[in-house]
């Protein structure tokens, strides 16, 4: 899933420019300036009397202020590096004796790391002349000292990306993240475990904690037992050295071999556990472009990737991978892969896009970016992949299902303190070095295995580690139940200048469709818009509501009070936009930011569904009246729901008891 600052952190901070400082192959110029003074050391007697002096700390050398003593004069040809030699003017070496600095290319030096002591030619010549003249018998002539070869080890070596280090990315960030996960003491995992069949609308209506904390649906017992075997089989097939069949044939075979699976959660469809990454490529098309994240920098890879190339990389042995990469934003709606990914029915009932965005404006004939396609993601992470701290765009909620592999989540609740720390961190230039977890409270670790599904509510901060190759499906959705948190996260995105690419697409237009949808759904309350003040006052007294209104007929019309309060937040946001659109002083003010906001607000109104500005204003006024009426009825309607639920539960128990009694009588016969 796309993340904000994600990243999601998908919207990652720009790394420091690599052109600001020259690159050295050795770790630091400080290590090359060790003094080898020729002064005679004190005698043994003196050393007993005098305290040992500490070696003075060598000052850091700013290479941008250095001058090369061997650079060719102006007009002279530039030196040509030999085979394997440093080919730029950003690799330096310092003479151990005179402390003069040289470009390696100017002196034809291949690799400065080959020497533990290196002397420039003038120093070597002078030392030879002095030694031959006999004026100094204490020291032999200077000679370069080659480093002894390192002892070879059969251990896998960490591939250090020097270019990444030069750009401000810390060394071994992958190992650092893994160490943080293993070293921290987290809060006990007390998130609720639910059965799949419990993911219903009744859960939201009767559980005050619903959509406030993450919940996990464990894998069915049969799925858990076969998961390791099936995962290994899928990876073996994908990594097999046998040549892959042609794309068209492979696609046909995959379609017949792989059958979408239904989970224990009503309405949810996921790929079968034997699906490999090559199968994904076969299904959606080998030339389909994918955005690949470089885990070390937490930013998009500069190279262009196709899903076929990604499948080859994914199944390359770990020791042969030069970089750790990740795919977290492959949306498959409108592709053949859509048949394998369907959100739970509860998610579709709550999702603003699925419920309120007109169906004819999000079908296959619509252009790719004309509507918010965020419902069906396929995520593919290799061992060691990591997504830094983020909140999904616009504070959207997430459903997340692991097909095979494992994901390790760290969660932090969206408290005022945590969100303030997150906002400050998103604006910081030291995100790569400053782990946000140090500034958050109530961190909880959750490991999600094959066949398990996680529901992440709006605003929860999280980072994700991949301990083994993993295939995941999931999606994002905005709801009526979390508008306050969603709007708060939108404000943070605006304050931290998150690029538009990493924000929830078409959010303003979607808000208009949501308002239009609720105005239509609350239309049965229109009959109360003509009540007199006296009748309205009676209606607001819950004790007399049932006598005035058939409350039972409104249980499917009037939502809970918390939802009505959130609808009012949507109303207020759209009213502010209308006020901005009709402000005549914006154009005269010369404020470019305000002018752009005014234009965006005007273009967001779906005139084909809402009408012009005057009709949009009238629609909001109508919705406001209906919401007010619904709020006056909400308590009575909720009480009616509780009674109906209690009666249904009692009837169900009675039916079950009667069934047991009948079975007992038959058994006695």
Curated annotation (Swiss-Prot):
EC number: 1.14.11.27
UniProt cross-references to PROSITE patterns, sorted A to Z: JMJC, ZF_PHD_1
Binding-site residues for substrate, renumbered to this chain: 407
Residue numbers binding Fe cation: 390, 392, 462
Keywords annotated in UniProt: Chromatin regulator, Dioxygenase, Iron, Metal-binding, Nucleus, Oxidoreductase, Transcription, Transcription regulation, Zinc, Zinc-finger
Cofactor(s) listed: Fe(2+)
GO terms classed as biological process: chromatin remodeling; regulation of transcription by RNA polymerase II
Cofactor comment text: Binds 1 Fe(2+) ion per subunit.
GO function term, MF aspect, one: zinc ion binding
Catalytic activity reported: N(6),N(6)-dimethyl-L-lysyl(36)-[histone H3] + 2 2-oxoglutarate + 2 O2 = L-lysyl(36)-[histone H3] + 2 formaldehyde + 2 succinate + 2 CO2
Compositionally biased region (Polar residues): 16-27, 36-49
Function statement: Histone demethylase that specifically demethylates 'Lys-36' of histone H3, thereby playing a central role in histone code.
Domain notes: The JmjC domain mediates the demethylation activity.
Protein name stated in the entry: JmjC domain-containing histone demethylation protein 1
Biological source species: Mycosarcoma maydis
């Amino acid at each position: 899933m796309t993340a904000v600052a994600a990243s999601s952190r998908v919207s990652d901070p720009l790394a420091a420019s690599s052109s600001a400082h020259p690159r050295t192959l050795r770790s630091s110029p400080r290590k090359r300036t060790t003094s080898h003074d020729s002064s005679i050391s004190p005698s043994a007697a003196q050393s007993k009397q005098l305290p040992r002096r500490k070696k003075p700390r060598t000052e850091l050398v700013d290479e941008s202020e250095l001058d090369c003593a061997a650079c060719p004069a102006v007009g002279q040809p530039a030196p040509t590096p030999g085979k394997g030699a440093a080919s730029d003017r950003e690799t330096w070496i310092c003479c151990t004796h005179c402390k003069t600095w040289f470009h390696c290319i100017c002196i034809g030096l291949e690799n400065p790391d080959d020497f533990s002591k290196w002397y420039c030619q003038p120093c070597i010549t002078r030392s030879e002349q002095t030694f031959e003249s006999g004026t100094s018998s204490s020291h032999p002539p200077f000679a370069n000292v080659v480093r002894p070869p390192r002892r070879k080890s059969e251990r896998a070596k960490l591939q250090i990306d020097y270019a990444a280090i030069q750009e401000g990315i810390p060394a071994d960030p992958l190992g650092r993240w893994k160490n943080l996960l293993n070293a921290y003491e987290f809060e006990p995992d007390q998130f609720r475990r639910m059965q799949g069949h419990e993911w219903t609308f009744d859960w939201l209506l009767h559980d005050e904690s619903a959509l406030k904390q993450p919940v996990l649906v464990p894998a069915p017992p049969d799925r858990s037992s076969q998961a390791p075997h099936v995962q290994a089989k899928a990876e073996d097939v994908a990594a097999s050295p046998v040549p892959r069949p042609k794309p068209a044939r492979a696609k046909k075979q995959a379609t017949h071999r792989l059958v979408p699976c239904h989970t224990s959660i009503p309405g949810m469809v996921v790929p079968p556990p034997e699906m490999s990454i090559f199968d994904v490529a076969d299904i959606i098309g080998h030339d389909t472009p994918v955005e690949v994240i470089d885990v070390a920098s937490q930013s998009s890879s500069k190279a262009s990737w196709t899903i076929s190339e990604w499948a080859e990389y994914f199944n390359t042995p770990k020791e042969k991978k030069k970089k750790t990469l990740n795919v977290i934003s492959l949306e498959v709606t409108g592709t053949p892969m859509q048949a394998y990914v369907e959100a739970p029915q509860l998610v579709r009932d709550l999702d603003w896009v699925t419920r309120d965005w007109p169906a004819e404006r999000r079908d296959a004939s619509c252009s790719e970016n004309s509507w918010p396609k965020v419902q069906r993601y396929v995520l593919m992470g290799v061992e060691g992949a990591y997504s830094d701290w983020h909140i999904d765009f616009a504070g959207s909620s997430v459903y997340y299902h692991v097909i095979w592999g494992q994901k390790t989540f760290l969660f932090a609740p969206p408290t005022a303190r945590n969100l303030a720390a997150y906002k400050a961190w998103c604006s910081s230039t030291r995100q790569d070095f400053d782990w946000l977890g140090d500034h958050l409270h109530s961190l909880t670790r959750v490991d999600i295995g094959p066949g398990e599904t996680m529901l992440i509510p709006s605003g929860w901060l999280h980072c994700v580690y991949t301990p083994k190759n993993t295939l995941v499906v999931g999606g994002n959705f905005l709801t009526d139940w979390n508008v306050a948190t969603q709007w708060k996260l939108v404000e943070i995105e605006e304050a931290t200048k998150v690029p538009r690419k990493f924000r929830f697409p078409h959010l303003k237009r979607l808000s208009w469709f949501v308002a239009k949808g609720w105005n239509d759904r609350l239309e049965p309350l229109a009959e109360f818009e003509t009540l007199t003040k006296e009748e309205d006052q009676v209606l607001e007294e819950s004790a007399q509501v049932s006598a005035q209104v058939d409350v039972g007929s409104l249980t499917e019309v009037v939502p809970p009070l918390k939802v009505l309060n959130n609808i009012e937040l949507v109303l207020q946001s759209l009213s502010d936009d209308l006020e901005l659109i009709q402000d005549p002083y914006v154009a005269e003010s010369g404020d470019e930011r305000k002018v752009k906001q005014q234009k965006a607000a005007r273009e967001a109104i779906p005139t084909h569904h809402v009408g012009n500005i005057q009709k949009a204003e009238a629609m909001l006024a109508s919705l406001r009246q209906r919401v007010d009426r619904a709020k006056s009825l909400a308590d009575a309607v909720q009480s009616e729901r509780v009674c109906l639920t209690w009666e249904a539960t009692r009837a169900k128990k009675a039916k079950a008891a009667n069934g047991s009694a009948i079975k007992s009588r038959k058994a006695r016969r």
